Amino acid sequence: MKKLMWLFVLAFPMAAQADYLDVIGFKMNPGCTMGKYQQIVQDFRDQWANARGYKVEILVPGQSSEVGMYYWVGRISNAEAFGKGLDAWMSAQSDPNSGPAMLMARFRECVTNQSRAGYITR
Protein backbone atom coordinates (compact mmCIF):
# COMPACT_ATOMS: atom_id res chain seq x y z
CA MET A 1 0.00 0.00 0.00
CA LYS A 2 2.85 2.40 0.84
CA LYS A 3 4.42 1.75 -2.56
CA LEU A 4 1.15 2.58 -4.27
CA MET A 5 0.83 5.79 -2.27
CA TRP A 6 4.40 6.85 -3.15
CA LEU A 7 3.78 6.06 -6.79
CA PHE A 8 0.72 8.30 -6.76
CA VAL A 9 2.54 11.13 -4.96
CA LEU A 10 5.53 11.01 -7.29
CA ALA A 11 3.55 10.49 -10.47
CA PHE A 12 1.11 13.33 -9.90
CA PRO A 13 2.93 16.10 -8.03
CA MET A 14 1.18 18.85 -9.97
CA ALA A 15 -2.37 17.59 -9.44
CA ALA A 16 -3.18 20.28 -6.87
CA GLN A 17 -1.18 23.01 -8.60
CA ALA A 18 -3.22 25.80 -10.21
CA ASP A 19 -0.94 28.22 -12.02
CA TYR A 20 -2.07 31.74 -12.80
CA LEU A 21 -1.70 32.91 -16.41
CA ASP A 22 -1.39 36.59 -17.29
CA VAL A 23 -2.32 37.02 -20.97
CA ILE A 24 -1.79 40.35 -22.72
CA GLY A 25 -2.68 40.91 -26.37
CA PHE A 26 -0.55 43.60 -28.00
CA LYS A 27 0.49 45.16 -31.31
CA MET A 28 3.92 46.47 -32.24
CA ASN A 29 4.34 50.22 -32.51
CA PRO A 30 5.93 51.62 -35.68
CA GLY A 31 9.70 51.37 -35.48
CA CYS A 32 9.73 48.49 -33.00
CA THR A 33 11.01 45.13 -34.16
CA MET A 34 10.48 41.72 -32.63
CA GLY A 35 14.21 41.63 -31.88
CA LYS A 36 14.01 44.89 -29.92
CA TYR A 37 10.91 43.70 -28.09
CA GLN A 38 12.49 40.36 -27.22
CA GLN A 39 15.44 42.21 -25.68
CA ILE A 40 13.05 44.19 -23.46
CA VAL A 41 11.32 40.95 -22.47
CA GLN A 42 14.68 39.36 -21.62
CA ASP A 43 15.63 42.38 -19.51
CA PHE A 44 12.26 42.07 -17.74
CA ARG A 45 13.02 38.41 -17.01
CA ASP A 46 16.51 39.18 -15.73
CA GLN A 47 15.63 42.29 -13.70
CA TRP A 48 12.20 41.39 -12.34
CA ALA A 49 10.47 38.15 -13.26
CA ASN A 50 13.02 35.44 -12.48
CA ALA A 51 13.39 36.52 -8.85
CA ARG A 52 9.62 36.25 -8.39
CA GLY A 53 9.05 32.95 -10.17
CA TYR A 54 7.21 34.64 -13.05
CA LYS A 55 7.83 33.02 -16.44
CA VAL A 56 6.95 34.69 -19.72
CA GLU A 57 6.74 33.64 -23.32
CA ILE A 58 5.64 35.58 -26.39
CA LEU A 59 3.21 34.04 -28.85
CA VAL A 60 3.90 35.11 -32.45
CA PRO A 61 1.15 34.39 -34.98
CA GLY A 62 1.84 31.62 -37.44
CA GLN A 63 -1.73 31.44 -38.66
CA SER A 64 -4.23 34.01 -37.51
CA SER A 65 -6.93 36.31 -38.78
CA GLU A 66 -4.99 39.06 -36.99
CA VAL A 67 -1.37 38.61 -38.02
CA GLY A 68 -0.38 41.86 -36.28
CA MET A 69 -1.56 40.67 -32.86
CA TYR A 70 0.94 39.09 -30.47
CA TYR A 71 0.39 37.62 -27.01
CA TRP A 72 2.40 37.84 -23.82
CA VAL A 73 1.72 34.78 -21.68
CA GLY A 74 3.05 35.09 -18.16
CA ARG A 75 2.85 32.20 -15.71
CA ILE A 76 3.25 32.22 -11.95
CA SER A 77 2.43 29.76 -9.18
CA ASN A 78 -0.94 31.24 -8.18
CA ALA A 79 -3.14 34.34 -8.22
CA GLU A 80 -1.87 35.49 -4.83
CA ALA A 81 1.74 35.50 -6.03
CA PHE A 82 0.66 37.36 -9.17
CA GLY A 83 -1.19 39.97 -7.11
CA LYS A 84 1.78 40.57 -4.83
CA GLY A 85 4.09 40.97 -7.81
CA LEU A 86 1.66 43.29 -9.58
CA ASP A 87 1.29 45.43 -6.44
CA ALA A 88 5.08 45.79 -6.19
CA TRP A 89 5.36 46.52 -9.94
CA MET A 90 2.66 49.22 -9.78
CA SER A 91 4.12 50.81 -6.63
CA ALA A 92 7.51 51.05 -8.33
CA GLN A 93 5.99 53.02 -11.23
CA SER A 94 5.81 56.15 -9.05
CA ASP A 95 9.63 56.38 -9.12
CA PRO A 96 10.67 57.07 -12.74
CA ASN A 97 14.21 55.92 -11.94
CA SER A 98 13.16 52.50 -10.62
CA GLY A 99 13.92 49.41 -12.68
CA PRO A 100 10.23 48.58 -13.22
CA ALA A 101 9.41 52.14 -14.34
CA MET A 102 12.28 52.18 -16.81
CA LEU A 103 11.24 48.78 -18.16
CA MET A 104 7.64 49.94 -18.49
CA ALA A 105 8.75 53.01 -20.44
CA ARG A 106 10.61 50.74 -22.86
CA PHE A 107 7.59 48.46 -23.22
CA ARG A 108 5.32 51.45 -23.95
CA GLU A 109 7.69 52.74 -26.63
CA CYS A 110 7.62 49.37 -28.38
CA VAL A 111 4.06 48.01 -28.07
CA THR A 112 0.47 49.01 -27.41
CA ASN A 113 -1.59 46.62 -25.30
CA GLN A 114 -4.97 45.68 -26.74
CA SER A 115 -6.31 43.33 -24.06
CA ARG A 116 -5.43 41.67 -20.78
CA ALA A 117 -6.91 38.66 -19.01
CA GLY A 118 -6.03 36.35 -16.14
CA TYR A 119 -6.58 32.60 -16.18
CA ILE A 120 -6.25 29.82 -13.63
CA THR A 121 -5.08 26.46 -14.93
CA ARG A 122 -6.92 23.28 -13.98
Predicted regions and their residues:
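Non-heme di-metal
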Residues: 98-100
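Sec-dependent N-terminal signal peptides
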Residues: 4-14
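Short S/T/G/P-rich N-terminal loop/turn motif that feeds into the first structured element of a domain
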Residues: 14-95, 105-122
